[in-house]
Amino acid sequence: MTTGVQFRGTVPANSSRRWFTWGWPEDWHVTWYVVPTTPEQGGPQIDWDVEVERASSDDVTYWLSIQNTTNESVQVEARYAVLN
């Protein structure tokens, strides 16, 4: 298994941001997870969703939507794991 950070970003308070990452081989089994890197105690900071576009016969594009559920900006990392 291979893991890594695809990108880092900031999501402003009470808002959403959408990123995409392209050129992933269609035969890779990729899972995504998003982790806040801004510490804050007391509850969840983000919610996220991943959508998939088959960009070509060989490549996949992933669209990551991240929602900040707090009243402060949150820095995030979009992490991936290639399972095969």
Each language-model region and where it sits:
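Extracellular attachment/recognition segments
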Residues: 1-84
